[in-house]
Each structure stands twice: as C-alpha cells, then as structure tokens.
Amino acid sequence: MNALELHAVHKSFGGVPAVQDISLSMPAGSRTAIVGPSGSGKTTLLRMIAGFEFPDRGRISLNGQVLADAQGAVPAHQRLIGYVPQDGALFPHLNVAANIGFGLTGKNPQRQQRIAELLDMVALDSSLAARWPHELSGGQQQRVALARALAQRPRLMLLDEPFSALDTGLRASMRKAVARLLAEAGVTTILVTHDQAEALSFADQLAVMRQGRLVQAGAPLELYQHPRDAQTALFLGEAVLLPAQLDQGLAQCDLGQVPIRERSLKGPARIMLRPEQLLVLADDGDGAGSCPGVVRDCDFAGNTCTLSIGVAGAGGHEQLVPVRSSGLHALPVGSRVRIRTLGHAHVLGAAPGA
C-alpha cells in the first residue's frame, strides 16, 4: 500500500515554475530520497508535502487523506507529519526533555514516560534530559530533533538535509542509525539531500529532480546502473561516457569491445560505464581483452584512489578515463597500464551527431 501519493503537483513563484507536474508514490514504511542540484525544486516539493507551501494544482494524499488539491489544503499542524530541518532547530531556551516534549499533551507522568521512551528510541542516555542544546554535540542535537519529530507518532517523516552539518564520520553513522530507527518505527520517510552517496545508501526509492521536474525514480541500484540520461548518470556519481558502435550485443568504443544487454540495438550510440567497472592491469604485453593506457593523474584518498588514464580516442585524441581502485594500487603518473572492463555497459542513447 502506498502511504504518500503525489499527482501532477505544480508550483510557481512569480510565474516561474519551481515544481512541474510531479507524480510519485511512496510505499508505507519506505524511505525515499529526493536528490537534485540547487534550484531543482526538491525543497519546494518537501515544503508542499509538509504544508508550508500549497500547490497551484495537483493533489497530495497521505494514507488516503487528501492533504492538498484544488479544493483546499489541510493546515500543516493538522497533518501529523514530522519534520527535521538541516540544523535541527532546537529551542535554545528549553532543555532536552522540554524540546522533545514540546507539543505533547496529557498528564505529566504520561508525558515524562513518553519523553523517556523517545530518548531510548534515539539512543540518548536519560542523563541528557536536563541538558541545554548548546551542551550537546552535533549528533546529539540531531537525535533530539528526531525524537521531537517522532513524539506525536507522525504518519510521515520529512528530513531536510539533516546530516549535512555533521562531520564526515559522524554523518555516516548517524545516517545508518536514523535509517534503522525509522525502519523499526515503521515510519514512511522522505529525505531531501544534495549528497548522492547519502541518498543511495539511505533510501529504498530514489527520485532525481532537475529544473522542477522528476527525471527518474526507482530503486537506487537501478538508477545508478541504468540512469535515464547522461546528466543523471553524472549527477549520481562518476561515469565514463563514450561514443560507441553497437552490433550484436557488443559496443565498439575507445576501450575495445564491451558487452551490452540490448542485443537488438545497432548503430552509433553513447554508452556508460562506472569507474568501478574498469580494472587496471600491469602492461605485461598480454593485451587480450584489454586496452592500453597511461596514468595521467592519481587522486589518492587513503583506502581508495581514482586514476585518470589516457587511452587512444577517436581521431587520435587522447581520452581520459577515470578508474576507481584500492588505495593499495595507487600508481605513479606515467605508468603504462592496461584497462579491462567488467560487466555490461549501459546504453544511454544516440551519440552526439549520430
């Protein structure tokens, strides 16, 4: 069953479209990440779901209830939607317990019990209940913000780049902890982020927006391996884009012959490979099934490195190809190597000028 349904949602500001005819379904209990460059409309879409903005046309429904359509809209405070902004937005004049309990009704013992449950749920020690926001670490502040958003048992959780202000190591651990917590609570969740790796690891469903439109939506692995176009391919990670000639399930390109899944395709096209699909081998004279190249740059990042390898391209021009490898295999500039492809190339469409 789908929890959230967006149907042809459109929003303009001053006559300039910000969100254009977005239709998207989110299954109950799922995690959807919405990604896109700045100005793509992802935050405006999130604000319309929350009730901070209203669509010019279209329909937003949650668990069968229409939240907004041409007839009107349910106010934000009546939607039972949790919202965690980028900075957590804790009240500085309230301690942790008061922040979490803000908006909770009921008698004090019941309220205190619920606060204790929420502290335990987000893995915060009960001793932190009396602390002030400025006495907490960034990760602790985000956990308090999440507990506050969960306090009233929301039907939907909205996360607006909640991990972006955290240190790299803490960001990864917090992302995993929050994903696990929300899955255990069974709360349908939407994450808006500009971090592609974060979106790929967090979500069950990935939605890519560009210029206010939904470009592609589906399972993260599907979008990463089979993007709809070159822009989406490059937005979701490094990609090797090459012109090729297709025939009988093979693509003839600057890297040699690469298999493709679409055996019926024939003629000029553009193909995509991810850097991890390229294997660097020593240039020992055995060229079978590989392509010669020269290391032009090595971007060393500790446990990994990205090699820029020059190979002979069309018309005698050198084509630089990024290859992702273990940091143990970082090679000096000028090294002669061979490249072997792994798996199938993805066909993006006709090559420029084809």
Swiss-Prot record:
Query: Where along this sequence does the record place binding of ATP?
Result: G36, P37, S38, G39, S40, G41, K42, T43
PROSITE patterns assigned to the protein according to its UniProt record, in alphabetical order: ABC_TRANSPORTER_1, ABC_TRANSPORTER_2, FBPC
Q: Which UniProt keywords apply?
A: ATP-binding, Cell inner membrane, Cell membrane, Ion transport, Iron, Iron transport, Membrane, Nucleotide-binding, Translocase, Transport
Q: Which GO terms describe its cellular component?
A: ATP-binding cassette (ABC) transporter complex
Q: Where is the ABC transporter domain?
A: 4-236
Report the top EC class in one word: translocase
Q: Can you tell me which family this protein belongs to? A: Belongs to the ABC transporter superfamily. Fe(3+) ion importer (TC 3.A.1.10) family.
Give the reactions, separated by semicolons, that this protein catalyses: Fe(3+)(out) + ATP + H2O = Fe(3+)(in) + ADP + phosphate + H(+)
EC id: 7.2.2.7
Quaternary state and partners of this protein?
Answer: The complex is composed of two ATP-binding proteins (FbpC), two transmembrane proteins (FbpB) and a solute-binding protein (FbpA).
InterPro entries, alphabetically?
A: AAA+_ATPase, ABC_SmlMolc_Importer, ABC_transporter-like_ATP-bd, ABC_transporter-like_CS, ABC_transpr_FbpC, Mo/tungstate-bd_C_term_dom, P-loop_NTPase, Transp-assoc_OB_typ2
What is the membrane topology listed in the Swiss-Prot or TrEMBL record?
Answer: Peripheral membrane protein
- Protein name listed in UniProt: Fe(3+) ions import ATP-binding protein FbpC
Which gene is transcribed and translated to give this protein? fbpC
Q: Where in the cell is it found?
A: Cell inner membrane
